[in-house]
């Protein structure tokens, strides 16, 4: 994508927004646990993509590149001073309408995923919600594939425990 004109860059951005806007908003919300912060993150992600289009060399897939920008942006926002001012408890009712279905099981899953530790949540989000492969997640997060596999297993186990506990409560 090097040496692209402003027109080509804007056209390419429109394509990327169309392809990734909804899944990225969903991921950002589950990552940041705040709708306003997720929307801000989404804008920041697409701004970074626009500014850095000419740096994409095809060494990884486009999706991996976009997700790496998204994860890094969410990580930065999550660790900024602003994140301390927001309520970090997520309920499915707080989710942006286009990001979650209203099925009770879906609501329980969203709440459970949001309740995971960040390092487990991010691999679950990238694997199940963004459909990245283990090697793509490893590249996106800058960790080994075995670390990704371990976090996926721990995340699944934790989700299973959380969801089974909720079934018993009802």
Model-based region annotation:
Residues 55-57, 68-88, 154:
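Arg/Lys-rich amphipathic alpha helix in sigma70-family domain 2
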Residues 76, 83-114, 133-135, 168:
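Internal acidic/polar
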Residues 71, 75, 141-165:
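DNA-recognition helix of helix-turn-helix
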Residues 123-127:
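A short pre-motif secondary-structure segment
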Residues 6, 44-61, 81-82:
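Sigma70-family region 2
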Residues 1-26, 30, 97-98, 110-114, ...:
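N-terminal module of bacterial RNA polymerase sigma factors
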Residues 26, 40-47, 60-72:
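Structural recognition of an alpha-helix C-terminal capping motif at a helix-to-coil junction
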Residues 36, 135, 146-149:
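Residues within helix-turn-helix
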């Amino acid at each position: 994508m090097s040496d692209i004109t402003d027109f080509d860059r804007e056209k390419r951005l429109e394509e990327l927004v169309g392809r990734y806007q909804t899944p990225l908003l969903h991921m950002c919300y589950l990552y940041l646990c705040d709708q306003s912060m997720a929307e801000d993150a989404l804008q920041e992600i697409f701004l970074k993509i626009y500014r850095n289009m000419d740096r994409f060399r095809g060494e990884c897939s486009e999706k991996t590149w976009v997700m790496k920008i998204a994860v890094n942006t969410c990580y930065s926002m999550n660790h900024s001073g602003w994140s301390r001012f927001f309520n970090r408890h997520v309920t499915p009712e707080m989710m942006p309408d286009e990001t979650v279905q209203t099925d009770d099981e879906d609501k329980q899953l969203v709440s459970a995923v949001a309740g995971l530790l960040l390092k487990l949540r991010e691999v679950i989000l990238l694997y199940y919600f963004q459909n990245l492969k283990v090697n793509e997640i490893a590249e996106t997060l800058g960790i080994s594939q075995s670390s990704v596999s371990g976090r996926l297993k721990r995340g699944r186990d934790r989700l299973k425990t959380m969801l089974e506990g909720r079934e018993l409560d009802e």
